[in-house]
Structures are given as C-alpha cells and as structure tokens.
Design a protein with these regions (language model features):
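Hydrophobic transmembrane alpha-helices and their immediate junctions
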Residues: 225, 253-258, 350-395
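N-terminal hydrophobic segments of proteins, predominantly signal-anchor/transmembrane helices
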Residues: 31-33, 37-57, 63-124
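A membrane-periplasm/extracellular boundary helix in multi-pass inner-membrane enzymes
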Residues: 159-169, 240, 257-296, 300, ...
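Interfacial loop-to-transmembrane-helix boundary motif in multi-pass membrane proteins
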Residues: 39-40, 87-100, 121-124, 133-166
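Transmembrane alpha-helices of multi-pass inner-membrane enzymes
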Residues: 72, 266-267, 387-398, 402-450
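Alpha-helical transmembrane segments of multi-pass inner-membrane proteins
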Residues: 23-28, 99-104, 144-187, 193-259, ...
C-alpha cells in the first residue's frame, strides 16, 4: 500500500535496496560480534543513514531495518547477561505504561483489532531501543563512550546534508521514503537526509548536541568532542532551514547558560511556572499563544501549533480517556498533530500524556539528586547536567513537533540516560555508596565471575568529616601518624560520603 505524505512511504510491502540489505547485514554482524556496549551505536547509524522505507514484511508483520536490528541487539544483550543487575524504577514503568496504553487504546477506539500488531511493532521500536540503552549504558563511563561513538557516526552525515543543500538533490532518495528533489520554502532549501522531514532531521541532531557539549570539562579531548559535535549539529540545523531546530538550539543554549545556577534550579523552575501562570491570565489568548509568535527562518507554522494546543484543551473530554481516531474536525488543518504531548494523548489517552510528563519529572529528580552530591563544576557534575539539558531540549521540541519514523529513537535514547541516572540515585539513597560497589554498576567487573568488585582500601588514618574546617575556613586535612610526627594530607574533595568519583561505576581519577 502506498501512502502519500511529505515523501513517498511504502508500508505493508517489502522494500529493500541492495545497499540497505548490506547495511543491515553489517549492522547485525557488528552487533553480534563486537562488544555489546557498541550495540546502540549501530542502531544510531541505521537511523541516520537509512530511511524507514527500507523494510521487510514477514508473515504480515512490518519490519523496518531499525526494528529488525533492535531485536537483534536485544537478543545479544539478553544472551550476554547485559540486563543482569538492572534495577527498574519509575521511569522504566512510565515508559512501558505509555507504550502499553497506545497498544491497547488505538485498536479499541478505532474498532480495528488487527491494528494491535502494528502497535506492537511500534512498541518494539520504542521499548526495544529504550531497553538496549538501559542494558548497555549503565554509568557515566558508558555514556561518554556512547557520546564519542555517536559523534564518529554522525559527523559524516554533514557531508550528505551539505551536498543536498548545494545540489538540491537528496542522495539518500535511492532507498525510498524521501524525495529526490529537496523541498523549498520561502526560497530556502529544506534538507532532510534520510529523515521523513527536515524538521525531524534538525531535531534529531539537536538532541545529540548536549551529549557532546557535556564533554567540555574533560580536557583537550573533551573540548574537541564538544567543539566538533557542536559544529556537526549546527551545520545540519542550518541545512534544514526550519524554525523548530533553531528554537530547540536556543533553548539548549539557555539551559547550559543556566549551569551556574545549578544549586538554585528548583527556584528557577518554580519561578518559570509562576510566570507562566500569571501570563496565562494576563494574555488574551493564553500563554500557549506565545508559540504563534516564533518564526526564526520564515514561513513558520507557529500559529497552527497554537490552534492545535487550543483545540486539544477545548476537546479534552473527547480524547482524555482512551484517545480518539481523528482530530480533523478540531479545525482547519488540525489533522496534522505537530505536538508530541497531544499526540501521546490522542493515541493513548491522558494517561499516556501523563506518563510522558512523569518520566521527565523523575529524570530531573534523579539528576538533581546527583547535582547536589557530586563535586560542583567537575566533569561528572557537568555531564549529569548535560543529560538534564538534553531532556529540557526535548521538552521544548515536543511543543512544536511530533516524532515519527526513526526520529522517535532519539527520545527513548535520551530518557534512557535519565533512567540510568535515576537508577543510581535510588541505589545511593537506599544505601549510600552502594552505587560504586562494582566496576560497572549493575554488572560484574570483567573477570569477576559475578562477584562484586572491591575498591582499594583507603590509606590508613582518620579523615575528618568535610564539615570540620581548619582555621581560615580551608577544608580540614586528614591526619596520619607516621614517624612519630603527624603528617598532613589534604582531605579528598569528595563532598558527601559515597560521591568521590565512584558514584556511577567510575574508578577514582576517571
């Protein structure tokens, strides 16, 4: 069946290009034969370079290449014991709840039971990729490895986008699903690469940007990764010529600019909510009308997005319980749901929307826990903050776009990072210091045969609590007896107990 949209997409039909088959075979072989921690990187490569029109139909079930590779990755991780020791929590429950609501509600509301198989496939795309990240990214060291590998994979894509901008032709159109000739709006080429829309392409790379900026405090190598990653993301955003990725970049910039207010983030959030509440009663059309005023590159559809939010509020009773089959009657052009929060509600009811919000809130809670306990302005502190900035950027993007195709992957990758940090926060809250018992949190250290690794004993001597201060306000020194005289060594700059660099599976000095 052919479905016409912004680009020609093929569903329920096997559509394979020889190069697409080759890419899938290489990705699956790499997933099976290389270290398991690299599995999500190969999924990222498929998402960036292969359109979702490349798919196989097996016994009536649709398998885009990314979905097939995700199943292979899940099997590889499960067989290798990658999920051993994984502690699931609130974020994991909410992500699963959101997927389950859509699997149940769409077939029931539409009256088409056969759609349950389609929704199960979508659930594999979302939950599968989410669990691949949760099984492989278990600490900050894994997160850093992922960000480095993501840059290696994503950087060559800038060449494809620049060629498309220079020629007006998309070289990835040979795979199908994306047009050969680049769309033009207001006289500007809107490059899209392998993605279904230029907006989605820009948002995908903007979502990766915080992971690269988060490396800034790691010396020369970290600054190089941050600089090159920023250039990659900005080049793609420039080629897309869309307001949404530009606005998302502005929000991320504001988020990182607020890093120096990290100790007062709760006050910042409360102030923002109070300001929005006041503006909602002062403004004639409600605070969400502000989105209609945004037009960064010309030809923006901000007013459509305002009307969509307004209509969703006015029709709340229609979709709140189990979603709805159509929003076409909400207003002119409102069948196009360019808001992820509303799309979740339309597909899975208000519970699905709350699950999306709730996962964000719990992620911020876990991030805030570690920000209060890690050495301020250190590289680990900044990396944790960067994950928060990434989620904040997604919150802004979701007001103006709804993800589909391979782009949905980037949200579940991002929230999985939040789930990892929240998991370690729960461990440490229950038993301070327990998050640092193994070389990699939740997994046995290599060669340990399942036995938790033990950290080297501290030097003999009594380390005074951080609260005790020497004259003049300097941190207290630890005193060790040696040679009949009291030797003095500086107290480790560790903050509260259990936060001296071993909090997320990192050895001291990493």
């Amino acid at each position: 069946m052919l479905v016409l949209g912004d680009a020609l997409t093929v569903t329920d039909v096997t559509t394979l290009h020889p190069m697409g088959v080759g890419a899938l075979v290489v990705a699956c072989m790499a997933i099976l034969m290389s270290p398991v921690r690299l599995a999500p990187v190969y999924l990222l490569a498929l998402a960036i370079y292969i359109p979702t029109a490349q798919r196989m139909v097996v016994a009536g079930a649709d398998f885009p290449l990314l979905r097939f590779a995700a199943l292979v990755a899940l099997g590889r991780i499960a067989v290798g014991g990658g999920f051993r020791g994984l502690s699931l929590g609130g974020i994991d429950f909410l992500v699963a709840l959101g997927a389950l609501m859509k699997i149940l509600c769409i077939p029931i509301v539409s009256g088409k039971p056969n759609l349950v198989f389609q929704q199960i496939g979508s659930g594999i795309d979302t939950l599968g990729i989410y669990m691949v990240i949760r099984g492989t990214v278990r600490n900050l060291a894994d997160l850093r490895r992922y960000s480095t590998a993501a840059l290696v994979v994503a950087a060559p894509a800038t060449v494809i986008f620049l060629i498309e901008r220079a020629t007006g032709r998309n070289m990835l159109s040979v795979f199908g699903g994306v047009p050969m000739f680049t769309a033009v709006r207001e006289g500007k080429l809107r490059c899209q690469g392998a993605f279904s829309h230029a907006i989605l392409a820009g948002c995908f790379f903007v979502a990766l940007l915080p992971l690269w900026i988060g490396r800034w405090r790691e010396g020369f190598r970290g600054k190089t990764i941050a600089g090159v990653g920023t250039a990659v993301a900005l080049l793609v955003v420039f080629c897309c010529s869309s307001s949404t990725p530009v606005v998302a970049t502005v929000f991320l910039t504001a988020g990182f600019a607020g890093y120096f207010l990290w100790s007062s983030l709760r006050a910042v959030w409360v102030s923002g909510l109070v300001l929005a509440f006041i503006l909602n009663f002062v403004m004639k059309h409600g605070v969400w009308h502000l989105i209609a005023r945004i037009d960064m590159v010309g030809g923006s559809t901000g007013y459509h997005r305002y009307l969509l939010i307004d209509a969703a509020i006015n029709h709340f009773g229609e979709w709140a319980l189990m979603g709805t089959t159509s929003t076409m009657h909400w207003g002119n052009g409102l069948f196009d749901i360019t808001n992820q929060y509303i799309l979740e509600g339309v597909r899975g009811g208000f519970v699905a929307t709350l699950a999306l919000f709730g996962s964000m809130v719990l992620a911020f809670r876990g991030i805030g826990y570690w920000l209060r306990r890690l050495p301020p302005r250190g590289m680990d502190h900044f990396m944790v903050y960067a994950v928060g900035a990434a989620i904040f950027g997604q919150m802004a993007i979701f007001l103006a776009v709804s993800y589909f195709g391979q782009t949905i992957m980037i949200w579940y990758v991002t929230i999985a990072f939040g789930g990892m940090i929240a998991e370690q926060a729960r461990r440490d809250a229950r038993n301070p210091g327990s998050a640092s018992l193994t070389g990699a949190v939740g997994r046995p250290a290599p060669g340990a045969s399942g036995a938790p690794a033990k950290w080297p004993a501290r030097p003999r001597g009594r380390a005074l609590p951080p609260a005790e201060l020497m004259p003049g306000g300097a941190p207290a020194a630890s005193r060790m007896q040696g040679g009949g005289a009291e030797a003095i060594r500086p107290a480790p700059q560790s903050g509260p107990p259990g936060t001296d660099g071993r909090y997320l599976g990192l050895a001291p000095g990493d």
